[in-house]
Amino acid sequence: MSILERLWDLLGLVFGSTFERVGSLATSVFGSANARQVAKLQESADRITAMEPKFAAMSDEELRDQTVLFRKRLREGETLDDIMEEAFAVCREGGKRFLGMRHYDVQLIGGMVLHSGAIGEMVTGEGKTLVATLPAYLNALEAKGVHVITVNDYLARRDMEWMAPLYMNLGLTVDAIQSGMSTSEKQAAYQCDITYGTNNEFGFDYLRDNMRPAAKGDDRFPSEVQQCQGPLNYAIIDEVDNILIDEARTPLIISGPADLDLGRYGEADRVARQLKKEEHFTVDEKQHNVTLTDEGVRAAEELAGVESFYTAGNMEWPHLIDNALKAHYLYKLDVNYVVKDKQVVIVDEFTGRLMDGRQWSDGLHQAVEAKEGVPIKQETQTFATASLQNIFKMYKKLSGMTGTAMTEADEFWKIYKLDVVAIPTHRGLQRIEHPDLIYLTEKDKFKAIADDVERTHKWDVVVLKDGTEIWGNIKSETDSVVELLPKGEKQTESFSHEKIVAIERAGRPVLVGTVSIEKSERLSALLERRGIKHDVLNAKQHGREADIVSQAGRIGAVTIATNMAGRGTDIILGGNPETLAWSQLQHKYPTRLEVPDAEWKALVDEIDERENMSAEGKIVREIGGLYVLGTERHESRRIDLQLRGRCGRQGDPGGSRFFLSLEDDLMRIFAGDFVKSMMERMGMKEGEAIESSLVTRRIAAAQKKVEERNFEIRKSLLEYDEVMDEQRKRVYRYRQNLLDGHSSREMLLTLIHNEIQSQVETFLDPNYGVDTFSTFAGGKLGCQLDARDFQNMDFEMADTYAKDQAERASEVTVAEAVEENLPESMEDEWNWKAMATWANTHLGTNYQDHQLKNKDREEMIDELIAHAHKQIEETDLSEGEPLLEADYGLRVLCAWMRHKFGIETTPEEFRDVEDRRKVTEELNRRAEAAYTEKEAEYPVLTGISRFTDKQGAQVSLDREGLVDWVHGRFNHELSVDEVKLNRDDLKVQLIQYSKQTASASGGMHAQAAEKVEDLFGRADADVTASLASGQSGKLEALATWLQEELGNRNTAEDLSRMNRAELTLAVNGAVDDKFHPEMRRMERQILLNIVDDSWKNHLLTMDHLRSSVGLKGYAQMDPKVEYKREGMRLFESMWDSIGERVTDLIFRMESFNDDFIRSTWVDARTRHDDAHEAGRSAQQAAQMESNTAAQRAAAGSEGRAEGSVDTVRVEEPRIGRNAPCPCGSGKKYKSCCMRRDG
């Protein structure tokens, strides 16, 4: 580091501390904004407390009924803010009765902060889990869903089971989602008022839902293919900094196997092992990057056995070798990952947990697997992806809580628009934070840590007034004298209390926080050699986490833990009897909710008494509480604060200290030179330590620098993901609209209109003909031609001009080819063979290289130009003559309409129409009419296909079944004799019946719209049907009409919760289900499968774009800007292709696969069949077999390729064989519906 840099750092430290003091002085005089906000919330807390006697006097049933009353008030127009104080008072009373815990005032304040959609910073041990019940209960009253989000499955389940008695006794439902749950289990959990789960599980469920073929609750489809999650309404995030900041860098990806060669990873690993650091590549730990030098590239090319990495077929090598080098030099075993069961499992750098199922992307995971010699997993192709940042930003309201948020307040606001409010503690903080100790080497540091653990754990320490410390065991103590047996001595010594400053008792519990598995195991070995019994908590002992943590506060406990971030378990002084009780009962009961209260209380009391935990807790408090040691500073200050926060909870005593060395990663990379020069000036030697506030501030500055860098990384990720986020939202919104019942007909007609408008704009452009001719002529002549030059030319003029331009261009092309292969100034590099090959390929000659060698260079150029001119002159451009005719664009448009939609038009119809919009309107009208014809034809196709049986060459028609179906579907009487027509005549006849039935749908749609409008009147858009209807009876009348006229199953209660838009969709869907069920099902399947397939392919394209866009930087372009521009171009191209593919299929329904047509058939009596099979067959019809894996993944953990048929049972009296058929046909039952009923 230069002198100027050191001086700048020192100035920054000095001025920074000065400004901090000035800010603190101003705050002490005027008060902080945070304090004023808390004071305002305290007023609400006082009012809640005043209500306590009122609710305390209620019976359990009366208290439970408050939930019903609150919901009634909300339906009548009150808001959550209006009922907040009363709801909090009810929740507080519920906590007292059903949990044995009363919410403190500061917890009420925390609940208000969370309800407002902000982040509450609460010190560890202040009861965040209980705080979450307040806003969760309040917001669950709306019945729109509340998600409580934690960092792992264990905490999600534990917190749900712990708080469930409160929710359930207040009349709410609650459950937790867990990884590995079946689809039906998750649907049940999401159906609850409050759902607990992990950030990843909520995120992945969002992505899975957007791959499913049916909306939540759509009973036309099997439950396993329906969506689970529902709208994202309100989320409460525990450890919000860990989830929204640390985890935000990791995108969530659902992927499937890609067809790639795995052997290349082993080859790249072999090459990487032979390259030498510094000579062949450099490692930048600060930027987490490895870069090959020029010498390294040449060495790697030689080792890989290729001529150049930058020629076709070899361009993947640099990326493979970069990944292999990163695997060896940046990703370390037992730090970044572990090897478990011959698999590489990632270790979360912030929590120390194993992340089973996670993979590094872009081939890095495979590179690490090759390094470790374990089986290499297949690389994957993305089916769905999103960052946690963008998923959580979609919640209508978001809140969170953590012990450490203020350091990241700026980022929370900039990214999520979330304020941070620091909540005061219930009791004063008694934690003593000792200054850092800094050592020269890591070896010295670990020895000092082991000494400190031994001192605290094994020995009583007498501290004298002169600063001397004597370690030993106190044998006796009186008011005046202490008898101590010093360490290693056989004789006791006596010390007068007058000479003693302090006595530190042995057995104080110690928690040591490390940054990696490797460091925790190294320290464990040191303690074992000293005979100190201890527990190690890291990713390898994940299963014993609860047992270990529950004992960490007991007398004499020594616990080594990798990062405590996200652990979520309080360390209670003396031990936690409830954790031990559950560890005994978890094998007997599936959840804590199943444990009888009496058995639970008896076991907890028995453990507490047996283990003497309550008494131990008092002793531990007397000897100083939990002592926390940090083995090094984390790059994030929050992680250090979380480690410190493990002690001193709820006003308990405690202490913490960090031990550092110059060899620590943070010190070495960011602060090493500065601190090392200071220690050298102070004359420090190995084994010695310094305590310096200046060094501590320098370390804090280094941490802040890293945090700023990480923020920039996250911000960059967000900027890249913004492109995909907008595209994802557009695709998912389109898809969701389809699932939610938006008219698939209207969506298809929009695609048709867009296509027609696009083609009209293209074909009727005045320059379309000359543009086409210039492209055609340029391709034939092998040169670039400017379309503008051909305006107002006839064919002869255009032919002459084009060839003249081509001859001029050929002269330049020949000269360039000669200069490239036979450079005039470097005759020794002439390549006659390449020159001959070029001439033969481009000019149609038949030269051998020796023939050209015998020619003079200039003579050869003239001869090649002559060949080029001759070739151009002989080129026939007559095919392009029609392109220059005035009505060429109109003729192409008419041909396109005929080919695309089967609609006949002539240029004469539009030749005199100057306004292109009128052409578009007329073509749209004709396309809609053609589509209406298809709409009438398709049900007939499904019916004939359904009742036609093909056995080899034999084709038979079930006439009786068809007659029965025609009667039910079109309400038309038809005899068996009438269907003894040939298939084409029968089809024509049935289409007429279909048209008659379909014509009634328009009137029914109008009638439905009128009824909805009458029900809602002038009500606001968000008002529900029940509130709009009131006591008028209109809602019940609408439900009756839907049931009697359309056979719809929705009850008045089902409709009551819908607003105007939702009810409109429901009634229009009911009309379509009555009159066009087959067509709507077909449209839906075609749209879903083409959208899903196109999106999946687009994601792969965007993956490739993102990996290559960095090269734009070499061309002085901003890669992010280019990524956004090119990404949007690709997306619009994808969207256009969706329209083309869908409309191509819809207007060619006659050529659909028979299996697909049958899958969209709907029984006129029940309208239920195997919808999942319909989805599969639609894929066949659209020729999108590649999407099957994605759909299967979306169907849930069962991975079923086909769904089971819903059985519809109707209990009716048994009908005799010879009795009249109840359908009214006049036939006997055995000759009519008995066949159909089986």
Curated annotation (Swiss-Prot):
Lipid bilayer topology: Peripheral membrane protein
SMART domains cross-referenced by the UniProt entry: SecA_DEAD, SecA_PP_bind
Compositionally biased intervals (Basic and acidic residues): 1199-1215
Assembly notes: Monomer and homodimer. Part of the essential Sec protein translocation apparatus which comprises SecA, SecYEG and auxiliary proteins SecDF. Other proteins may also be involved.
PROSITE patterns: SECA (PS01312), SECA_MOTOR_DEAD (PS51196)
Entry keyword GTP-binding: no
Region named Disordered: 1194-1220
Protein's name according to its UniProt entry: Protein translocase subunit SecA 1
Annotated Pfam families: P-loop_SecA, SEC-C, SecA_DEAD, SecA_PP_bind, SecA_SW
GO cellular component: a single term: cell envelope Sec protein transport complex
Main location: membrane
Binding-site residues for Zn(2+), renumbered to this chain: 1221, 1223, 1232-1233
Family statement drawn from the similarity comment of this UniProt entry: Belongs to the SecA family.
The protein's required cofactors: Zn(2+)
Function noted in UniProt: Part of the Sec protein translocase complex. Interacts with the SecYEG preprotein conducting channel. Has a central role in coupling the hydrolysis of ATP to the transfer of proteins into and across the cell membrane, serving as an ATP-driven molecular motor driving the stepwise translocation of polypeptide chains across the membrane.
Entry keyword set: ATP-binding, Cell inner membrane, Cell membrane, Cytoplasm, Membrane, Metal-binding, Nucleotide-binding, Protein transport, Translocase, Translocation, Transport, Zinc
GO BP annotation list: intracellular protein transmembrane transport; protein import; protein targeting; protein transport by the Sec complex
Entry note: cofactor: May bind 1 zinc ion per subunit.
Compartment list: Cell inner membrane; Cytoplasm
